[in-house]
Amino acid sequence: MRSNGCGDLRKDSIDAVVQLCGWVDRRRDHGGVIFIDLRDRSGTVQITVDPDLGAEAFAVAEHLRSETVLQVHGKVRARPAESLNDKLATGAVEVLASEIVVLNKVTGNLPFPVSVHDEENTREELRLRHRYLDLRRKRMNDNLRLRARTIQAARRFLEDEGFIEVETPVLTRSTPEGARDYVLPSRVCGGDWFALPQSPQLFKQLLMVGGIERYYQVARCFRDEDLRADRQPEFTQLDIEMSFMGEEQILQLNEDLICAIWKSVKGIELPRPFPRMTWHDAMERYGTDRPDTRYGMELVTVSDIVQDMGFKVFSGAVKSGGSVKVIAVPGGNDALSNVRIKPGGDVFSEAQAAGAGGLAFIRVRDGGEIDTIGAIKDNLSDEQKAELLKRTGATPGTLLLFGAGETAIVNKALDRVRQYLAKELNLVKPDRQNDAWNFLWVVDFPMFEFNSDENRYEALHHPFCAPNTDDLGSDPAQWATTLPKARAQAYDLVLNGLELGGGSLRIHDSALQRQVLQTVGLPLEEAQAQFGFLINALDMGAPPHGGLAFGVDRMVMLLAGEDSIRDTIAFPKTQQARCLMTDAPSSVAEKQLQELHVSSTWVDPAEDEN
């Protein structure tokens, strides 16, 4: 049907007779000669239709609409010098059409223009509702091809390293290991339910017990959770697990993998080794376990400096066990007015959205003088001023922004403000090579975190992470005192402030696994009922093992320079977990519900009000 791709023609194609297929991107009538930009996934080429050289082709071309599907027969020739187009890879040539066949017409009105010239002005809702049209666009086509190259590069690397691709079940049982499950009723086993996997975590551990030793999978995963720009209810992980390797070996191998992907997909040699930072340092310096290290404005703790001052917001925070922290904003004096920092201002609103009551601020003037207002001004001694300048490294023109209160809220608020100001002040310049890819390993996560609402400890990652036994101690009777400081042998790979992947060494001792499950609130009987298959497997000579999973959607988003993973997935859901194109999820017939032995108690709120 076709001999060449539209985007494949170059100067060395001149005089070749070709047959092309594609969509009409644009049509231009120049008074006697018609020009058609014909597009397929390889690119776009100009078709010239001259009535003197192809009357029938010209008659067809006179009535063509955008997105009509064509087959064009013609001869490649050089473009005249005045019509060369250096914006197109095919811009040095054109095809003189001798025959045009309409393969399919557009019979209705297009919901939006598909041409690359009009891409930027279409609402996302329309794009998702008519995704089949959106996929014709160069941007989306390029993103999906980049996604395919990313997965291919990962597969090549892992196969060369002796890994085996193994598929794990999609229909499994619900286990209390993380977010809310998607569940499916069983028709055959009435009253019982399957769950879609949130990850292949337990199955990949069982593969290690089974002697596979090196496993990987491009795995589909499902989580029924609130969505945002970089989350979907169904998503893809590059899942990896290996036996007889320590944490250092696992980190090195996965660095090699990431470097291989970036080299293959972007042609970039990433600097090695990736920097490392403990979880504690990340929280202390950035207020988050996913720090963006492309710019400064690190959090600085100043609780000891201000704890005795008369400003009760500061002193009260310290006395109640909280913190006072500050970020130094270079050039902030000129860039940020008082109005923006006070209630109602955009910077204040960012802190408030993270749970903070507000922000205090100090301006460093020329000569190092400190300028502030209100209670801070009246209660800050010269010694405290000098110590603040010394600790923050503030220079003239710097704005100091303070957060005070519960440490977790202070961290969250200043982290959010820091990220917001980095964009506002253009501190991130991704066009510069050294700013584009800041990888960071975050290590030594806490094993447990305390849930004050339920008055119990929970696993920070999941209860299958191997704890640092030096922290916990060998006697579980001592754990009551060691739990708060116990570290997990866990690690996350962060890229430009986003978590790219994470993993850990796993518990491979059944007694330790039982104890950890008990610690997070699962009695022995319940632990056996929920995870007995895993615990029994650990009793059968489980090897030491560990692994990691990368978020493929997020990785491709970063490689493509997109802001949302929806632009790297062929058919994504909205933030309400709906598919606008197919109108899924949808209701099902009552007969289907009866076959599944279930009934719906859902009441439409709108109908209920009536």
Curated annotation (Swiss-Prot):
The record marks H30 as: Important for tRNA non-discrimination. Residues 201-204 are annotated as: Aspartate. PROSITE patterns: AA_TRNA_LIGASE_II (PS50862). InterPro entries: Aa-tRNA-synt_II, aa-tRNA-synth_II, aa-tRNA-synth_II/BPL/LPL, Asp-tRNA-ligase_1, Asp-tRNA-ligase_1_N, Asp/Asn-tRNA-synth_IIb, AspRS_core, GAD-like_sf. GO terms for cellular component: cytoplasm. GO terms for biological process: aspartyl-tRNA aminoacylation. It is found in: Cytoplasm. Coiled coil: none annotated. It comes from the Bacteria. Pfam families: GAD, tRNA-synt_2, tRNA_anti-codon. It catalyses: tRNA(Asx) + L-aspartate + ATP = L-aspartyl-tRNA(Asx) + AMP + diphosphate. Its EC number is 6.1.1.23. It is an enzyme of class 6 (ligase). The keyword Lipid biosynthesis does not apply. NCBIfam families: aspS_bact (TIGR00459), PRK00476.1 (NF001750). Homodimer. This is Aspartate--tRNA(Asp/Asn) ligase. It comes from Synechococcus sp. (strain CC9902). The gene is aspS.
